[in-house]
Amino acid sequence: MFGSVRLVQEVTRSNQQTAANTTSPASVDESIIAQEPSNVSDLTSEPVESTQIKQQGNTEASQDIQQEQQQQQTHIHPQQPALSAQQTQQQPALPCWSTPTQHIPISFSAITSPSVLSSYKSRDFRNLFTTTNSSPNPSSPSPSSMKSHTRKNSKYTVRHHRTRQSSFNGTTNPPAYFSSNSILRKQPPTHHPQRNFLQLQQEQQKSKSQKLLCLWPLPTVTRYMILIALFVSTLNCLHILDLSCSAPSFVVYRFDIKNMILSPFLFNWTLPSMALFGWNVLILGLFEESLAHMVGGTRRFIQLLLVLFTTVSLVRVCLGLIFSKATGYAFPSLFFSNTMHECSQGLCVCCIF
């Protein structure tokens, strides 16, 4: 390729030299003819000769300029062909907004402060130090590198990478080893005296035994039951509501639904009734604390409580009706009495139990 380019350049140079040689004797002859004294009487030949001389001078000047440009291009780009050089000369200059621009490279060190750079350099140095110490020779691959356990909870990682804990009898195991970032580090031995371990066991047992009696803050359902019972009993005491304990005969024959629904929350403002009301609240709080987690939350416990309340109330009404019918023929005063269905003393849980 380079040889063909050189041949083309030599051919163009030889053509230019021959053209210059052919034009030079013609110009010399014309100049000699022009310099000879003419005694011609015609004055019209002088302006024609002067115009020919001017044209010849212009052509010679243009040829000289082209030769100089070609020589400069050959000196600057000796391996570039002449045709490509002429094409580049003929291309118009692009405007300033269409010229391609280069992005200025901005390094991380030019933006950040020297303190941050020093911390990054120290970290990189530390990582290099750890990798050089931890990485074995490339010629002899270690068996640990061949086994890749990607799962974090696999049996291998649990067995080989967990820290050994102290035994239950108070004796401590020898210092364990664990691997972190391919570096084996020695774990300092942990000495737990037997006294601390026994204290922890006693505290756990106490917390389990006292958890049932620790009802503060009160559970959610117990709070609402206390508020409803206090509200209903206060309105009944002030004679705003006329409530009484529900009797099955009135429920069946007179449709006394209001007393059947509100009588479980009703109690009298006497000392025995208030003591029974407190005992019922304690029972409900203990059951809610122990059963709410087993059932699936407070909402499920409320649903279960409503179902039990309705079913037990219906069962008690049916049993009371049968008992009053059975005993009413012997004791007529029991036909429309509420002796078998006393109030639940402020809580519907007594209907269930």
UniProtKB/Swiss-Prot annotation:
Gene Ontology CC: nucleus
Chain spans, region Disordered: 11-96, 129-174
The UniProt record lists the keyword Metal-binding: no
Gene Ontology BP, a term: regulation of DNA-templated transcription
Compositionally biased region (Basic residues): 148-164
Alphabetized UniProt keyword annotations: Activator, DNA-binding, Nucleus, Transcription, Transcription regulation
GO molecular function: DNA binding; DNA-binding transcription factor activity
Coiled coil start-end: none
Bias type Polar residues, positions: 11-26, 36-58, 165-174
Record field: compositional bias (Low complexity): 59-95, 133-145
Subcellular location: Nucleus
Chief site of localization: nucleus
Job of this protein: May be involved in transcriptional activation.
Name under which the protein is recorded: Putative transcription factor MTF1
Organism: Mucor circinelloides f. lusitanicus (Mucor racemosus var. lusitanicus)
Biological classification of the source: Eukaryota, Fungi, Fungi incertae sedis, Mucoromycota, Mucoromycotina
